[in-house]
Structures are given as structure tokens and as C-alpha cells.
């Protein structure tokens, strides 16, 4: 990307890329689910995938993540902004993935429909609302991080809390598959969760929100400081002798 592009232009380009990528992702997932007669994933034997097709699907997921990281690296001019743009790309991609699936096949019908989010390292199960909530947080944090100034020194405690939140969310997503793991691969593929731990997920979401909230607060303070300096400079420049 050209160094002359403003951060707003870079943000718009990343969003456009993520939206287009979401359509490709939704189309691919629709093809696969139609092929195995699982357009709606929450049904008996939810992952009737052959070994060959399963391997291809795992590599497709890995390639998707590589594309998201790549657009972040290309868009950002510092590591902070690169991570921010990657977060924006992931969040926008995830939200529009569900929007386009709804357009293509009428699923999900509600935000509480169950979905298989990822297969790495185990199947992740959750209602659609859960990944969408995380995606919106990523868009918020990524936008503030990519559009704001570079901090002299950012506190680490919000990231520590956010990391704990990520671990908790992963545990909630993979708890059913992990319980079936001792019974072998077939048992893991046939898992069909019946309940979702919303209280624990809510705690994890709150913890994951700390980096975004801390970043937003820092950006607001930085903006207020810049305005104060400009006001002081203008007052000194135009004050009578």
C-alpha cells in the first residue's frame, strides 16, 4: 500500500478486503455444507467429512488466518497498527461471513443458532451471537489502535486481562469436544452440544473488552491533550502584548 494513503483510507481498504473475503468464505462454506448435506450444522452427525476433505478444510482455515495477518502487515506502518488492521479484518470478515451466509442459504435464522466456528485444534461450538460479539470488540479495538497515535508506553494489565478472557472463551467453545476427546476422533466429530455457558462467556467477553476500552480511553486522552496544546498555542499567538 502506498505510504501516502491516510489511515482512514487504509481502514476503508482493509474493510473492503474483509467484506469481499467474507463473501468468498461464505460461498466456500456453503459449497462444503451442501456437499455433505449440512447447510444447517446443528444436526445429528454434524461433521460427516471424509479424511481427505477434512484435511483440505483445516488448511483452508489456516489459509484464511494467513490472509488476515497478511492484510494487517500490508496496511499498517507500525506493529501496533498492523495488529490493529488485522483485528479489523478478522472482525469485519466474521460479521459479514454470517450476513452473506444468511443471504446465500437463509442460515443462520437467529443469532442463537449453533455453529461450528473452527476445527483447529478441536471443533469450536457456539451460538452465532458469541463470535459476532468478539468480532465487534476486535473491530472496536482495531479501529482505535490503527487510527490513534502511538503511545509512549501502553499499560500491560489490560492485555493480561484480555488474554485471560481469550483462554476462557476458547475453553467455553471447545469444552464439549474436549470431553469427547478421550473417546477418539469419531466421538469428537459427532459432538452436538446442548447448552452454552453464557455466564462464563460473558465474563470472558468482559475481560476481552479491557484492551479495547483502555485503548479508547488512551486515544480520547491523547486527542484532548492535542486540542489543549493547540488552544494554548493559538491563545499565545493571538494574545495582546
Tell what function each PLM region has:
Residues 48-70, 119-140, 195-201:
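Membrane-interface loop-to-helix entry segments
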Residues 84, 91, 135, 142, ...:
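Small-residue hotspots
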Residues 18-35, 172-176:
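Alpha-helical transmembrane segments of multi-pass membrane proteins
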Amino acid at each position: 500500500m502506498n505510504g501516502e494513503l491516510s489511515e482512514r483510507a487504509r481502514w476503508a481498504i482493509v474493510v473492503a478486503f474483509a467484506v469481499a473475503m467474507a463473501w468468498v468464505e461464505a460461498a466456500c462454506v456453503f459449497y462444503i455444507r451442501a456437499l455433505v448435506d449440512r447447510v444447517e450444522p446443528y444436526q445429528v452427525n454434524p461433521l460427516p467429512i471424509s479424511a481427505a476433505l477434512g484435511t483440505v478444510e483445516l488448511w483452508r482455515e489456516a489459509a484464511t488466518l494467513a490472509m488476515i495477518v497478511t492484510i494487517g502487515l500490508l496496511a499498517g506502518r507500525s506493529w501496533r497498527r498492523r495488529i490493529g488492521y488485522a483485528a479489523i479484518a478478522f472482525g469485519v470478515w466474521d460479521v459479514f461471513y454470517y450476513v452473506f451466509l444468511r443471504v446465500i442459504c437463509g442460515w443462520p435464522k437467529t443469532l442463537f443458532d449453533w455453529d461450528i466456528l473452527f476445527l483447529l485444534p478441536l471443533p469450536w461450538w457456539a451460538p452465532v451471537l458469541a463470535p459476532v460479539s468478539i468480532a465487534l470488540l476486535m473491530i472496536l479495538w482495531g479501529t482505535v489502535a490503527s487510527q490513534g497515535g502511538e503511545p509512549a508506553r501502553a499499560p500491560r494489565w489490560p492485555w493480561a486481562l484480555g488474554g485471560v478472557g481469550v483462554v476462557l472463551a476458547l475453553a467455553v467453545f471447545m469444552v464439549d469436544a474436549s470431553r469427547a476427546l478421550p473417546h477418539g476422533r469419531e466421538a469428537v466429530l459427532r459432538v452436538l452440544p446442548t447448552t452454552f455457558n453464557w455466564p462464563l462467556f460473558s465474563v470472558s467477553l468482559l475481560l476481552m473488552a479491557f484492551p479495547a476500552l483502555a485503548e479508547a480511553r488512551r486515544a480520547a486522552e491523547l486527542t484532548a491533550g492535542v486540542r489543549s496544546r493547540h488552544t494554548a498555542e493559538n491563545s499565545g499567538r493571538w494574545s495582546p502584548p
